[in-house]
């Protein structure tokens, strides 16, 4: 009797896990509508990303790539992103608390706005190539194209035309 109950519980648990995995966010693709999202920037100021008002979204998935992207964005100036109707989202999900204690104050030194991606489901929606920043071109609130930028190796200006 106990074994039967344990087997049934295990089966229910397995089905639940499989269903949740299939419902998890899939990465955006061309012509797909991008969802609005809310997050905070490095100054702890609320930000709402509205894709219908933007032309580009840059997403760094790891700290090393983010550092390289921030170095390039700093040289381009504070208004470069806003002048190109672009936003920059840095993945901080999974960063340990002690890391945040040091990383976020460093981010405050950058003049450009850094949207802090602290939601695993949000970050999972953006395709990734290791060591590169995802650059999503947006038109009418939909993905127009997806490209990848290697900060310090290729010019961002070539992607944000």
Task: Tell me what each language-model feature is.
Residues 1-8:
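Positively charged n-region of N-terminal signal peptides that target proteins for export
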Residues 87-89, 103-130:
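Short, internal strand/loop/helix patches
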Residues 49-66:
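Short active-site neighborhood of thiol/selenol oxidoreductases, capturing the structured segment around
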Residues 37-54:
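A short beta-strand-turn-helix
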Residues 65-106:
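Structural microenvironment flanking redox-active thiols in thiol-disulfide oxidoreductases
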Residues 19-34:
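N-proximal helix/coil linker or "cap" segments that precede and/or mark the start of modular domains
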Residues 50-52, 118-156:
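Thiol/disulfide oxidoreductase modules built on the thioredoxin-like
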């Amino acid at each position: 009797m106990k074994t039967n109950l344990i087997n049934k519980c295990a089966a229910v648990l397995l089905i639940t896990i499989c269903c949740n995995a299939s419902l998890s966010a899939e990465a955006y693709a061309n012509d797909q509508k991008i969802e609005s999202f809310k997050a905070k920037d490095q100054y702890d100021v609320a930000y709402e990303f509205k894709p219908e008002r933007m032309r580009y979204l840059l997403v760094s998935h790891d700290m090393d790539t983010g550092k390289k992207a921030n170095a390039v964005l700093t040289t381009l100036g504070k208004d470069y992103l806003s002048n190109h109707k672009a936003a920059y989202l840095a993945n901080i999900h999974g960063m340990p608390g002690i890391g945040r204690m040091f990383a976020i104050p460093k981010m405050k030194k950058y003049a450009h706005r850094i949207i802090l991606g602290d939601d695993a489901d949000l970050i999972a929606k953006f395709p990734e190539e290791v060591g590169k920043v995802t650059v999503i071109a947006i038109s009418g609130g939909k993905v127009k194209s997806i490209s990848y930028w290697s900060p310090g190796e290729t010019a961002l200006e070539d992607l944000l035309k």
